[in-house]
Amino acid sequence: MSSSALKKWEIVIRFASSIPDLSLEISDAQTTTIHSLFKIVRNRIPECRDKQLKMVFQGRLLSPGFTVERAVRGNWQRDENDDPNIVQKAFIHCIVGPTLTEEELASQDQAQSGLNSNSESPDDLQNAQTGETLRGFDRLREAGFTETEVNNLRSQFHRLRGTNLDSLTEDAIREAEDDWIDNGGQNSSADELDMSYETLLAGVLIGFFGGAIACYFLWERTMFSLRMQLSILVGIICNFAYGLLHSYRW
């Protein structure tokens, strides 16, 4: 018997509203889909019976075609010597949307059944369900975030990371945001790494050769990112140290 079969799966559906948490024991997470969880929620919770439902795990919108195992992948890793009877638990947030008609609910079920019968991959399922694929922090709009909240989060994220938005393509920026949402920023792309080195080098050169003029950039926070400002400060310190050593030499 495989280790996957020995695991006990518990999914806790947590709602943004005052609806109590719904705990579900999943016997086969490899075949149970998010769409199946929609049906369970509608059957067990009267308030959700005719509502539009969306589920989010760690800031990532889950496609109805995803299996539970794929949706929470990485959350079940454990040592092989652990007790197989220990229940693995994950929390999935459920967003309750507007009321749907019976025709709309039936249409969703029919569309999902058709996708399952065609045996499409999870990525194809997601593309078929969402017409336009949202990337980066724009995905959070599906989770109920307003456009202002998304823009504020994006601005703060790139400011703290010192991202030079002018030197990156739109795809590279969205890729960095996707990486942070999906992996907690553990995996950085090569383009972003190269950009960070270029930013540090440019800042040090500005600080070293700019002299006192470079100090202006330390107070003008809207002109450069935090990472660039720190590298400029390093350049100024290097300039000061070089001048000090040069004066002692003479």
Swiss-Prot record:
Glycosylation sites per record: N187
Pfam families in alphabetical order: Dsc3_C, Dsc3_N
Sequence ranges of Polar residues compositional bias: 107-130
Keyword Transport: no
GO biological process: protein ubiquitination; SREBP signaling pathway
One Gene Ontology term, aspect cellular component: endoplasmic reticulum
Source organism, top-level taxon: Eukaryota
Major place of residence: endoplasmic reticulum
Protein name: DSC E3 ubiquitin ligase complex subunit 3
Organism, as annotated: Schizosaccharomyces pombe (strain 972 / ATCC 24843) (Fission yeast)
